[in-house]
């Protein structure tokens, strides 16, 4: 069973060092110093309370960003590159769903995923998310791409 807690500075540094290969390299983050200087993602002091780390024993397996919005709750997820396709994404999303539906019981949970990333799409579908609507174009700090919005209804 995974455990989680609010993300620490040392965990942020570790996540910045993760190195995805091939087409997944689009998910590589800038170095920690750059993230801090630009106040990006979990290095933004106004948003860092939204980020959680997930452990399997002593191993950091992933992190999430959980952000309440007007009509739903956005979740961003990252799994350690050497632990992808080992079931951690589903385990993490199970914990995220529990937290989100406890804190925001009437709001659906949603995420955005690059259309080509069928590995992630399949993981999210197994975790109870479904593609909503048509793909859309979006530019992120990691580049431009075509994305699906996937939704998990409030329980």
Task: Identify the role of each PLM range.
Residues 76-78, 87, 123, 133:
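Glycine-centered small-residue hotspots that permit tight backbone geometry or close packing
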Residues 83, 87-96:
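Conserved acetyl-CoA pyrophosphate-binding loop and the N-cap/start of the following alpha-helix
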Residues 6-12, 17-84, 99, 103, ...:
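Acetyl-CoA-dependent GNAT
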Residues 106-110, 114-121, 126-130, 134-155:
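C-terminal "cap" of GNAT-fold acetyltransferases
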Residues 78, 91, 119:
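Short alpha-helical segment within the catalytic ATP-binding CA
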Residues 1-2:
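Extreme N-terminal starter segment of soluble prokaryotic enzymes
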